[in-house]
Amino acid sequence: MRFLIIILTVFLSNHYVASQKLYKDKSAARIWMDVYLEAIKKDGLGPTIHARNMFHISAAMYDAWLIYHPEKGEHYYLGKTNNGFEFEFDGFDCPTNKDSAEFVSISFAAFRLMELRFQNYSSKVRAMDDFIFLMEDIGLDPYYRSTDYSDGNAAGLGNYIAEKIFEFGLAEQAGDEDGYEAPLDPVNPSLRPDIPGNRRIVEPNRWQPLSVVDYINQKGWDSTLRDWNYQLILAEDVFLTPHWGQITPFAMTTDDVSLMKRDGQEFKVYNDPGPPPYINTSSDEQYVWNHTLVASWSGHNDPNDQNMIDISPSAIGPTSGLLPESFEEYKAFFDFQNGGTISKPNRRNPITGKSYASNLVKRGDYTRVIAEYWVDAVNTYSPPGHWMKMLQEVTDDARFERKWMGKGKVLDQLEWDIRSYLALSGALHDAAISAWSIKAYYDYVRPISAIRWMSDNGQSSDSLKPRYHEQGLPLIPGKIELARENDPLVGENKENINKLKIYSWRGPDYVDDVETDVAGSGWILAENWWPYQRYSFATPPFAGYVSGHSTFSVAAAEVMTAITGSPYFPGGLREQHFNKNDFLEFEKGPSEDIVLQWATYREAADETCLSRIWGGIHPPIDDIEGRKVGERVAKQSILFLQDLFR
């Protein structure tokens, strides 16, 4: 047996040398994270699932790597009991060719776990070929499934780690084997956004699924999407992973959990922010203000808007320490009329010592570009994957030094990747658990439902004017008004007289061809309001509060700040370029070249948060409380890592 292990080790060593030549600029951890990120784009699963997968893959690679470097830290899974599941480990006799064995163990751990997870996914055919091709490309046998790691079998060790983590995943009942389905029946019937108003809603404080299939059948399939994306739409009334509060976290503990009950059902809620504002309560005014702000900002999504704004770091800085608490602070933090928030602009680039140059752009291009750049919906890396990709790009920057938390010696590429992937993916996993546990319990309404419901009620500003209703939309000159005599929206038979109208992005009815058409902003009946999104994915299939984008992004930004030892991107500036009429997919645009700029990781995260308001997906309450949860998650993760790593 020992002889066979020696032969296998020599064989793998030769292939390790070949693979190192092929992937000379990338570590084993990097090549496997790369292939997983590309698999996300081919998959129809949600951000919660991908955050968990990235974390489990990162933990598998970390535990495999640590076998060869026991002085570097403690195992996360191996030899420990996690949430009642025992990860037995009998020790490992490391081969003499340590580097090649390490490469093999990491590769088998990552590949086998991906294979086990994707075997039940609808995207199996689309993704598995890439996993298998990579294994063969680096000279490893994808069909070698032994988990016997005795006598220094590096491949068996990797397989063992992967299979134990997969078994652990089954034990926590995430739903790996049945599509992650969990019962959470909506209290409201579906809203068809192609039909005016929202008369069918029963509870305006609660989530309402959307039904866009009929509209797609009328309008035609979105040519920018793939055929398999259509299957996602057919299940749009299913709340995505409402059971995620039951999933085992990375760094959070029972001290972070609140046990809540609603409708006879018990919920585990992590980092509970408390309830959002509800209509029919003392927080009526806050409810109306939050959703009305979304409608107000929607009017900015027009390239013909003459407003120019400076989006350089000298004009827009991070919001750390500035987040509002009271309703009055919310109103001061957000610019209801013009968009944006208060922040702490950067006086100068701390790396170069020079001031940041202004970056004037059309507001209507900026808002549309960030709404699409950060959307991270179908056929993208998803929000967790977007931040993992950003971490990789930071690491690739020639100006970046791989010093853990900015201190000590420069780490080799593999150690940096192993550590940083676990740190970031762990925090993203906890962000997903926190955000979705909150979403499931509070089950909060989305703007499209609230805005249309209030418009059906009428106006709440003046009891002497037509259509007065205490729970209607407020009248705001130039933003929300009544359709009066001689208004073209009134209709030939004046059927719409005194209905509410909003100055807003006009919606997908004005876009027949995304390559040539721009809906623009204008006066529309409020009952027809749409968010600035694809008509086929108008709003995500789960509750709004809190924003997943805000939670993911702030958690990621704070972790990246900690592990790099600096809040700043390498060189003190990161830019993302978009060419004229060569980026937007919801409609034509941008109308001019535009460059997004961020000095700090937190600025990028804050922009993500605002993109969801301009995109019509979240009101401020979803955003701000999500940011706060993200901050807490990051802090918990960083403290945990300090004990895990040596």
What is the meaning of each model-derived region?
Residues 1-21:
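Bacterial Sec-dependent N-terminal signal peptides
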Residues 20-646:
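Acidic/polar surface patches and capping/hinge elements
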